[in-house]
């Protein structure tokens, strides 16, 4: 194992990440998509994704004083759902989405929520900073999902929770082929439809304590304990 990485090696997506989907997606492209849809995101996706958000918050079991990191906070649609006796940090790399989130947090007086512009694959926090690290509907929207999850694990405290809600490719052979077929189309609204859940878990090394289907059968809530 090399002691030092070349800078260009750091920027190159993990080949295992690329193998999880038939589609490559670049951060600049995704940022452009979310810049365009920021104003209508809540209307387009709020209702259909809301059950998964509620279930994730319920399953987290947030305790008073817990430090929670939401990776991919978007428009801050989750912000008002968190109990006020915890500390929430929300990060996103889209200035347009964060502008909506900041307006929401200010309007609702959510003093326990802070928002920061940041790349999910390069979290600017010390190791073991958070009790719960949560990525709602994110990992199929980034160029390197494995790198993002490694960062989530790094900043999660030992025995803390890593919580992921995401669309994964169906285990049904017919639906699986459909997921792969439409992924080149769904990428135009900012996500890959064919991310493989077993492959994702194997490559990240995450060991789930629970996996549940949410909203519709193709979305899953995955909760892992950080060892």
Each PLM stretch: what is its role?
Residues 21, 25-28, 45-47, 163-221:
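C-terminal alpha-helical "lid/dimerization" subdomain adjacent to the S-adenosyl-L-methionine
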Residues 65, 156-162:
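Short glycine-dipeptide loop
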Residues 4-63, 77-78, 100, 108, ...:
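Conserved class I S-adenosyl-L-methionine
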Residues 132-144:
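A short SAM/SAH-binding and catalytic strip from SAM-dependent methyltransferases
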Residues 121-133:
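A short acidic, Gly/Pro-enriched loop at the edge of an enzyme's catalytic core
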Residues 146-158:
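A short glycine-rich, Lys/Arg-flanked "PGG" loop and its adjoining helix->strand segment in the class I
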Residues 67-122:
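Class I SAM-dependent methyltransferase SAM/SAH-binding core
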Residues 222-227:
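C-terminal lobe and adjacent flexible extensions of AdoMet/dcAdoMet transferase-like proteins
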């Amino acid at each position: 194992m090399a002691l030092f990485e070349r800078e260009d090696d750091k920027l190159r997506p993990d080949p295992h990440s690329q193998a999880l989907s038939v589609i490559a997606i670049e951060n600049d492209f995704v940022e452009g998509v979310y810049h365009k849809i920021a104003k209508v995101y809540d209307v387009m996706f709020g209702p259909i994704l809301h059950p998964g958000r509620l279930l994730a918050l319920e399953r987290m079991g947030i305790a008073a004083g817990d430090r929670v990191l939401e990776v991919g906070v978007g428009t801050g649609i989750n912000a008002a759902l968190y109990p006020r006796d915890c500390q929430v940090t929300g990060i996103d790399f889209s200035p347009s989405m964060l502008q909506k989130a900041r307006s929401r947090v200010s309007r609702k007086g959510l003093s326990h929520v802070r928002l920061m512009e940041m790349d999910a694959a390069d979290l600017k926090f010390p190791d073991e900073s958070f009790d719960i690290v949560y990525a709602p509907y994110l990992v199929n929207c980034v160029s390197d999902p494995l790198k993002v999850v490694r960062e989530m694990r790094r900043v999660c405290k030992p025995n803390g929770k890593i919580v992921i809600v995401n669309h994964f490719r169906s285990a049904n052979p017919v639906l699986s082929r459909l997921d792969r077929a439409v992924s080149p189309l769904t990428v135009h609204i900012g996500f890959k439809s064919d991310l493989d859940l077993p492959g994702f878990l194997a490559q990240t090394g995450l060991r789930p304590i629970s996996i549940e289907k949410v909203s519709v059968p193709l979305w899953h809530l995955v909760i892992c304990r950080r060892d």
